[in-house]
Amino acid sequence: MTKEKPAVFYNRIIDKGRLKKLMSWAYTSFGSAHCATMADELKTLGFRYATQAGVSISVDDLQVPPIKRQMLDSAEQEIKTTEARYSRGEITEVERFQKVIDTWNSTSESLKDEVVKNFRETNPLNSVYMMAFSGARGNLSQVRQLVGMRGLMADPQGEIIDLPIKTNFREGLTVTEYIISSYGARKGLVDTALRTADSGYLTRRLVDVSQDVIVREEDCGTARGLKLRAMTDGEREQISLEDRLFGRVLNADVVDPKTGEVIAQRNQDIDADLAKKIATTVAEVEVRSPLTCEAARSVCRKCYGWSLAHGHMVDMGEAVGIIAAQSIGEPGTQLTMRTFHTGGVFTKEAARTIKASKAGTIQFKDGLSTRRMRTPHGDEVEQVEVAGTLVLKPSDNGKMVSHALSPGSFVLVAEGASVKKGDLLVEVGAGQKTQKSTERATKDVSSDLAGEVLFDNLIAEEKTDRQGNTTRSAQRSGLMWVLAGDVYNLPAGAEPVVENGTHVNVGDILAETKLVSLSGGVVRLIPNSREIEIVTASVLLDEAKVLHETGGGSEQYIIETSKGDQFLLKTAPGTKVQNNANIAELIDDRYRTTTGGIIKYSGVEVAKGTKKQGYEVLKGGTLLWIPEETHEVNKDSSLRIVEDGQYVEAGTEVVKDIFSQSAGVAEVIEKNDILREVIIKPGELHLTEEAIADKYHEQLIQPGEEVIPGVTIDKLSYGEKVISTEGVALLVRPVEEFQVEDTPVEPSQGSINEQGAGRNIELHAVQRLFFKDGERVKSVDGVSLLSTQLIIEIGAIEGEDEDVLANLYADIELQDDPTDDEVKRLQLVILESLILRRDSDSDPFGGQVQTRLMVEDGQEIVPGAVVARTEIQCKEPGEVRGIRSGQEAIRRLLIVRDSDRQTLAIDGKAKVKENTLVVAGTEIAEGVVIEDSAQVLKVSDKEIVLRHARPYRVSGGAVLHIDEGDLVQRGDNLVLLVFERAKTGDIIQGLPRIEELLEARKPKEAAVLARRPGTCQVEYLDDETVDVKVIEDDGVISEYPVSLNQSVMVVDGQRVGPAEPLTDGLNNPHEILEIFFDYYAESKGIYEAALIGLRESQRFLVEEVQRVYQSQGIDISDKHIEVIVRQMTAKVRIDDGGDTTMLPGELIELRQVEQVNEAMSITGGAPARYTPVLLGITKASLNTDSFISAASFQETTRVLTEAAIEGKSDWLRGLKENVIIGRLIPAGTGFASQNDFVDEGTSRSPNGYSNVVTNDNGAGLSSRTYDDLDGSEILDDQTARAFTEGKSNRKDIISGDELISDDTPIPSDVQGKAPVIDDDAMIDDNWMKDQ
């Protein structure tokens, strides 16, 4: 078989990338069969040579570049310099941190380059180098960690740790480095696990939204197209125009702007060579795209372009939607949530720099203007404000070199300066175009030494917020000095006893605290304790003994008086009780009843009180008690056994399982068929007339009275009329009497009352009744009617507050009797307890503390006497400073020690004045340079006295925690620096960002977009806010509110178009759509406006999705994203149906609405008005025409219910609906076209293939000629088929489309030969038998 193509000879190293290109070239040029064979042969070749070379990998192959040590040293040197600048107060803590991080970052980067250079120059056959750079395994970042340095890591909060990992895995990590490493590594693992699930769900949603997109038409005939240009990020090209054009179809002729020659025509598809040619001549090309395709419910072949699977025009019936969904979903697992395959190593793009190519002088041209600016490293540089050109005029009068600079770049040289070759001229900023999104962050700065604070050129301003909190912040940048000294924290209540300027020695008292007794009394010192008790008043029960009884797991104390009365102690010894507390109760059974009953007072008077505490008896008398037993039942009435009014004997069962304890008349109380209570009333029952019963009802009957003839009462009784089972009767109930004395039993007590205190304390017995007069007591077992309690009474002193009494407590104590060891006595004491400070105080800044006791045990003291003094003593000699009096008094005191000063001898004249602050490195006299910053205390001819100090640079806007003159300890916070930092890329990137875009979510911090074109006015106001106005073309001024944490991206006078961002942040695609629609609706009509709006938001979405994938180095063809975005932007929301049948709020395809509106314009009806909407993929899936597909996706019940209510039909157009109900799917490239077969029956290919065979580019099969086949030829299906069709007179090849039936005559020249059969051929069995 002869080939017309020239032989190709490759002579170069083939790595992974080139191998990809080779395979793709083989595939597009020779088809799948040849490509597969070649791949096989390459594999064999590879194994063969790998075996011969014996490539292996060992630890020795990991060669660390020898220059590494030197690079680390220079980085450390640079950091030392930065630290020195920091200690001189030239840069802030934030700038220092930033500089350290950038230094290590660039060191790590340049070390990486060295690693590569080292391998390349010393041993290009090193197995690690070959492996990584051929693309077999591993990447540069991993090689860097093996033989370079691991670099900076982030901690779990995502903050960068400024201690880099200087070692690599070959050298081994230190313990610290290992721990720091494990943060990021763990994060990577967790991330992978979470990612898999997320990515799978994303793919499912994508498939669902696009499963019904199938190529159903040849050409939709649209004139619309999409303008393509290279996708850039700032200056950097992300996807070249060449790559974006490949496999597209042109929508307009491409004309060479120089020669006017037509390079390519409309509707021509673009292969790789043509793409390259077009990209080199023009910057923007209009192509056809699925986004602009007008085919109904599908995409046409021309708009889709090549099928990237085989590099030819897409076949009819190809399910391009599903391919698109898989192409976007599959790389999802490679996208990150946070870190990317580097085990948490921090990576950041280094700024691009421009260096002088030769020596010369610098000129600014084209209106280049700059302003002074402080870089993040604290260097003062010029930043480009208005773009222009920087020109280097060589000193050898050669050709001038010019560099165009965009705003934001840093110019490191002055105009007119002369530079040497290799000098750094410019750090190129990323430019205004990129989203330099920043966030406000804060950092605390704490003091490195103790001392007093001095402000140098630092002005504090106070702001009060709405809540009334006052914050003090620095108006502009300045220095805060801490002058060294020993700061003593004074304990609460300590008063200084020295004055400012006094000189003190070790052991001198600086301040003291007095411990004062308020009430006075007798001192009690407790051994081994820091507590001093002062007894103010006490009472001792001198004749009563205290008995201690234990039993049954509980213990109790009983007080026995000399008369034999016993009181039970209610509160345990050692507890503190308040005034009027009940501490003991008389053990006494005289008032105990056996059952419940009714209580009546006879002569007894009680005070008002509460049921809980009881009613205090004021005057004695008799208590009358009429017993009865009450059973509270609360059960169903059917369980009752006795009747109301029935007389029962003791022991009778009255209700199931309840027995009466005494004989008497039963009273039954029922409510709603529930038996509440059964009351048994003991007594004698006499049947009598009603009049008599009424007379004695609820009356006391005196002894000797005859109630009924023949019945005389012999003791005090109580009458009650009852209706018994036998009729009216009088129940005579017994009455018990209890005598109550006027005064209760009281134990004898001797009390001491300390002089000066004048406070009294005594125990006082009280009788308390627990029931009111006439109260019915419900009980079966009996109750105690009266109890005698011992109450503690603390006497008040004249003229004292009630609060004092309420706060006094008495202590219950048991005292040993001096005469009898067995006996304990009860004592009640009122104490004041004072706690001494610990001498070994935990505060290391407190100085030597010594506490002296001023009283002895048993000593009587007057109120206000000093019990102890705590003295704070000086630790090192020095001069006292920093004491303030009055309102400003602070609990600290400063001593300037001799070690805080330094005296330097000088020869010549001093160059500094007294009281000035000088930073390290300053020359203070001829030849005398100080090493540390200091304050000049004294200048004389011979010497200069300095006081050590430390400056801290404070940036403008920082929050000040302290004031001038304050004393600070080491480690105290001085200021909170507020600074802007670039948002770390992982805020949202990777999968979450893709999801946010495809679900069309509104971003959290959206950018403010201009609504109409115009010119910006940017005004920076005093209170740090920025005022942005746009003067629109018709003169209208619109204001745009900017929130505090957004930075403005436009400059004054800049021209902006519609939907251009004014601030940083992510654009909201809904807003882009709305702005363009509103802007063009009036001038172009709503259909065109809707198309423009949708086109802009489509472009935004496609580019943003591409950006995310590109940032991870994943290439996806635009057309896949376009297919998905097309599905998201197909619908509009009806605002007003006009004369159509559409309802407001309905979501309908734009195409459909426009068809209806066109019909309306012909009939003269009012058209429907609508707004274009952007649906997220989930929403779009739920709003498809097919309810079966939507229901199988999410919210099944809702979707099906709505479809049923609306009476929807499903036309089964997509793949999913057909699969669900078990039909064949309406897709696939082999489906027969409706067109008749062409060319008088010679070519029988369905139109899907006729195009492949006659592909214009010769990339297809038409460029081959076939001679006779020999047995070694490799054929794939298409080749075989095309071959048959090309030579339809040959009978020895049977293609798959020829169906041979039983009666087909077999050509004579075929008989006996084995035919070449492709795998689609359907061959009749009989024919095979005959062979």
Curated annotation (Swiss-Prot):
DNA-dependent RNA polymerase catalyzes the transcription of DNA into RNA using the four ribonucleoside triphosphates as substrates. The keyword Transferase applies. GO terms for cellular component: DNA-directed RNA polymerase complex. It catalyses: RNA(n) + a ribonucleoside 5'-triphosphate = RNA(n+1) + diphosphate. NCBIfam families: PRK02597.1, rpoC2_cyan. The gene is rpoC2. SUPFAM superfamilies: beta and beta-prime subunits of DNA dependent RNA-polymerase (SSF64484). Belongs to the RNA polymerase beta' chain family. RpoC2 subfamily. Its EC number is 2.7.7.6. Signal peptide: none annotated. GO terms for molecular function: DNA binding; DNA-directed RNA polymerase activity; zinc ion binding. Its cofactor is Zn(2+). Binds 1 Zn(2+) ion per subunit. In cyanobacteria the RNAP catalytic core is composed of 2 alpha, 1 beta, 1 beta', 1 gamma and 1 omega subunit. When a sigma factor is associated with the core the holoenzyme is formed, which can initiate transcription. One of its GO terms (biological process) is DNA-templated transcription. Keywords: DNA-directed RNA polymerase, Metal-binding, Nucleotidyltransferase, Transcription, Transferase, Zinc. Zn(2+) binds at C220, C293, C300, C303. Residues 1236-1257, 1294-1331 are annotated as: Disordered. Residues 1243-1257 have a biased composition (Polar residues). InterPro entries: DNA-dir_RpoC2_beta_pp, DNA-dir_RpoC_beta_prime, RNA_pol_Rpb1_3_sf, RNA_pol_Rpb1_4, RNA_pol_Rpb1_5, Rpb1_funnel_sf. It comes from Picosynechococcus sp. (strain ATCC 27264 / PCC 7002 / PR-6) (Agmenellum quadruplicatum). This is DNA-directed RNA polymerase subunit beta'. The lineage of its organism: Bacteria, Bacillati, Cyanobacteriota, Cyanophyceae, Oscillatoriophycideae. It holds the Pfam family RNA_pol_Rpb1_4.
